[in-house]
């Protein structure tokens, strides 16, 4: 009997170990499901609230602490999640969704700081290209106010902001296994064409809700095309805002999209990003406006995304 019990305990222990190893393996690389989906992401929760509230057949999956919601949005199979704020989170979790779900297209929705002086708070931009403005050389000061790149560094082509000289980033992809240097990552032409078909969409001028009192001074508009830039900084500086507009011809500046776009490029997955202006990145007359206009901006971005999915074929 004692021998039988020992053997039984050994078998149970081996079974438990096998299950544990199997679970660990599954968590290391399995696909959650095989349904082709559009991945929809935002940086933090309030940006995703409206979209989650309209998702049908919603089912949650937690991977590496990130909650993914599968379901249908405007009749399209989707997986929605929060990337987290800033570049590393955006890159890491964009790759995670590509690894664990059958993602056919990537869509980012959220807020941004306005850089183009021709745009207003509440406007929604859909840039054609995104670049990383903080991929930089911090050059030595060779004389007062003058910062000189080393002679061997031949990829410093853009104007500098003080000691900061923007540079392209090295990237590999399935189509270019040898590292290439790129500054701009281009949104998918077919997705941009779909966005152009909803360009006359009426956006909200006032915050929704019975207690809402916040309204914009100008009717917001949807702007397709142009450029956006991203980096690991919350920008609230008029001088840098002016530099970003003149140097990159940027409409908006944020903290995630260029990293997301780079991962999309590396994986050869089409992408588009909708960014609504919540503030002017330091260009306003008073304190930064994000606290006042965040909700209008986030809801307008989500409204455009919903219209885009309705139009998407």
Residue ranges and their predicted role:
Residues 9-22:
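Bacterial N-terminal signal peptides
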């Amino acid at each position: 009997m004692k021998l039988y019990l020992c053997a039984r305990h050994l078998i149970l222990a081996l079974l438990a170990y096998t299950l544990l190893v199997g679970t660990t393996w599954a968590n290391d690389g399995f696909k959650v499901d095989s349904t082709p989906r559009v991945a929809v992401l935002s940086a933090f929760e309030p940006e995703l609230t409206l979209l989650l509230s309209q998702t049908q057949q919603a089912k949650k999956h937690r991977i590496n602490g990130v909650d993914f919601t599968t379901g249908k949005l405007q009749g399209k199979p989707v997986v929605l999640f929060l990337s987290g704020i800033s570049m590393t989170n955006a890159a890491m979790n964009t790759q995670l969704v590509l690894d664990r779900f059958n993602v056919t297209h990537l869509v980012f929705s959220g807020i941004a700081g306005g850089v183009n002086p021709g745009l207003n708070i509440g406007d929604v931009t859909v840039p054609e290209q995104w670049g990383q403005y903080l991929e930089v050389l911090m050059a030595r000061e060779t004389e007062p106010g003058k910062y000189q790149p080393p002679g061997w560094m031949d990829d410093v082509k853009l104007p500098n902001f003080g000691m900061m000289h923007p540079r392209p980033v090295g990237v590999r992809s399935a189509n270019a296994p040898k590292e290439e240097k790129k500054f701009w990552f281009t949104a998918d032409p077919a997705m941009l064409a779909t966005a152009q078909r909803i360009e006359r969409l009426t956006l909200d001028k006032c915050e929704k809700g019975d207690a809402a009192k916040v309204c914009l001074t100008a009717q917001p508009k949807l702007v397709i095309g142009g450029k956006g830039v991203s980096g690991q900084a919350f920008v609230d500086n008029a001088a840098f805002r002016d530099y970003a507009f003149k140097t990159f011809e940027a409409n908006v500046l944020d903290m995630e999209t260029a990293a997301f776009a780079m991962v999309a490029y590396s994986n050869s997955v089409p992408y588009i990003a909708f960014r609504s202006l919540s503030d002017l990145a330091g260009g306003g007359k008073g304190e930064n406006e994000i606290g006042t206009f965040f909700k209008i901006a986030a809801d307008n971005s989500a409204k455009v995304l919903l219209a885009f999915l309705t139009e998407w074929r």
